[in-house]
């Protein structure tokens, strides 16, 4: 009985969620139905994300690390402008978002696009990997795709219903601490991690198409992840990671490149 309930937790966790389609599928065919918590609006998530983004910028500015390289900032803004022109192919309302692009001087290999279009790059990912414009466009397109698909709101919804599901299991069946941990593990492997990995794969594909439509070479996605693979000191198994492995990512991007190559050729 307990095992049956644990295996059914992904269904229990859909209670209180609404099915949505945040984007069009595009040439790459990203059509997964998403589930969002009914009481959590995109506007609320965007506001929370913007507050966190502005706090990050304020701290970087205080330390003298914000937008210190004017040439790189211009480079990022130019690439962003080209990519943003293409977002209506996936989501029409995104063209009116309050987009913002900033650069923090920091050695980490990182970049992000917060919900609502707040793009942030760290200088380390550009300088240490010696990225071309095409490769920057792949990273930026990937991060923009997370925002278009509202993966942040989806993650918050998953976290909420995961907690709700495990608490319900404990309450109904008197599961002790070990039982609750087992339920959490079932939820994690049955719902949370697969969705997280699929989110990353979706962002790869949508980012690939955005960049191609903007005139950036899709083959740069492969060279980018080859550089990331070289820069990594090892990686967790793909099954346990919220990101696909570099090798798996490269293979998927190589398979998808022919779907967007005509878009790139037309945009050149």
Where are these regions (language model features)?
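Bacterial N-terminal signal peptides
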Residues: 6-15
């Amino acid at each position: 009985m307990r095992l049956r309930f644990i295996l059914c937790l992904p269904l229990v966790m859909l209670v209180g969620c609404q099915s949505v389609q945040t984007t069009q599928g595009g040439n790459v065919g990203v059509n997964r139905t998403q589930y969002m918590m009914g009481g959590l609006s995109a506007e609320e998530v965007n506001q929370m994300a913007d507050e966190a983004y502005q706090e990050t910028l304020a701290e970087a500015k205080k330390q003298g690390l914000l937008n210190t390289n004017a040439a790189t900032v211009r480079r990022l803004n130019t690439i962003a402008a080209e990519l943003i022109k293409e977002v209506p192919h996936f989501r029409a309302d995104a063209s009116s978002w309050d987009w913002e692009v900033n650069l923090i001087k920091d050695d980490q290999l990182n970049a992000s696009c917060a919900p609502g279009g707040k793009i942030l790059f760290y200088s380390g990912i550009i300088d240490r990997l010696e990225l071309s414009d095409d490769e920057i466009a792949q990273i930026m397109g990937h991060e923009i795709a997370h925002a278009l698909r509202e993966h942040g709101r989806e993650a918050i919804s998953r976290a909420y219903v995961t907690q709700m599901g495990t608490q319900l299991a404990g309450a109904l069946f008197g599961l002790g601490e070990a039982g609750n941990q087992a339920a959490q593990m079932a939820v994690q492997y049955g719902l949370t991690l697969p969705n997280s990995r699929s989110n990353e794969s979706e962002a790869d594909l949508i980012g690939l198409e955005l960049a191609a439509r903007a005139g950036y070479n899709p083959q740069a996605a492969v060279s980018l992840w080859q550089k990331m693979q070289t820069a990594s000191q090892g990686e967790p198994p793909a099954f346990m990671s919220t990101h696909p492995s570099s090798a798996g990512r490269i293979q998927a991007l190589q398979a998808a490149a022919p779907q967007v190559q005509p878009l790139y050729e037309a945009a050149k």
